[in-house]
A protein has these predicted regions:
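N-terminal Sec/SRP start-transfer signal
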Residues: 1-6
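Mid-to-C-terminal secondary-structure elements
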Residues: 58, 64-215
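Alpha-helical transmembrane segments
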Residues: 9-38
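Membrane-interface junction motifs in transport/secretion proteins
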Residues: 30-57
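Residue-level signal for transmembrane alpha-helical positions in Major Facilitator Superfamily
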Residues: 12-16, 59, 112
C-alpha cells in the first residue's frame, strides 16, 4: 500500500443521493488521526519471482524514488496496511515493564504496521512524545519502534514509554527486541466509527538492513 501527498489535487466524486453526500461529509469531519487532504493511495503486489525481503524492499524504494520525482508530488511513502481499512487483529507481544495488573501474561496488540521512511510525516500523523523514524535508523544496530497513545497509556501507564522494549512473541524466543522511540497520535485503523486499538509501527528500511547484514 502506498500513499502520495500532492500539492494540488482535484478529486470529483459523483453521488446519486443527498443522504450519501451528507454521510460522506460527516465521515470526513471525524478526526481519524491523520491528514486525509491531498492523499492519494493505491496498492501494489509484487510477483512471486521477486526474491525475498531484500528484493521486495528495493523494488518499493525504487518506485517511491520515481514517484517523488513527479511534478506536484510532495512526498511518497509506503506501508503494509492502509488506515481506516485495516482489520482488527491480535498479535501476542512481549512488553517489558508492563504496568497492567490484569489480562493475559502475554498481551495482544491490535495492529502491527511496517512502514517506509517518511510514513508518519507524509500521513500527517503527529508525534506526541519522543521522535519519529529517522534515516539513520535504517543502519542502526538497535531495532526501534513507534507506538500509539493507546498502547503507551495501556501498558506503561505512569511510566515514560520512551526507551521501553517490546517484541513480537515467538515460541523459539528469537524475535528481536524493539526500543520505543516515539508515541504517535492514535489513528483509526478499522474505520472512523471504531476505536483506535493498540498499534506498533516498525520501519521497513531497518528490517531490510537487518536482513542484509544477517546474510
Amino acid at each position: 500500500m502506498f500513499v502520495i501527498t500532492e500539492t494540488a489535487l482535484a478529486v470529483i466524486v459523483v453521488v446519486g443521493a443527498g443522504l450519501l453526500l451528507q454521510t460522506v461529509h460527516n465521515l470526513k469531519a471525524v478526526d481519524a488521526g491523520f491528514d486525509r487532504s491531498r492523499l492519494q493511495t493505491f496498492s501494489i503486489t509484487l510477483p512471486p519471482r521477486t526474491s525475498g525481503l531484500l528484493g521486495r524492499v528495493r523494488v518499493y524504494q525504487t518506485l517511491l524514488e520515481r514517484l517523488r520525482e513527479i511534478p506536484g508530488v510532495r512526498n511518497a511513502t509506503g506501508m503494509t496496511g492502509l488506515p481506516l481499512e485495516s482489520p482488527l487483529s491480535s498479535y501476542q507481544t512481549e512488553i517489558a515493564n508492563n504496568t497492567t495488573t490484569s489480562g493475559p501474561p502475554i498481551p495482544s496488540i491490535n495492529y502491527y504496521q511496517r512502514v517506509m521512511s517518511g510514513f508518519l510525516e507524509t500521513m500527517g500523523i503527529p508525534i506526541m512524545q519522543g521522535r519519529s523514524f529517522q534515516s539513520t535508523d535504517a543502519v542502526s544496530a538497535g531495532m526501534v519502534a513507534v507506538v500509539n497513545e493507546t498502547l503507551a497509556n495501556t501498558y506503561w501507564k505512569g511510566r515514560n514509554p520512551i526507551g521501553q522494549p517490546l517484541r513480537p512473541f515467538s515460541t523459539d524466543n528469537r524475535s528481536p527486541w524493539f526500543t520505543v522511540i516515539g508515541i504517535a497520535k492514535d489513528v483509526k485503523q478499522s474505520g472512523v466509527d471504531q476505536p483506535p486499538g493498540t498499534q506498533v509501527y516498525l520501519l521497513v528500511d531497518q528490517l531490510e538492513s537487518a536482513s542484509r547484514h544477517s546474510q
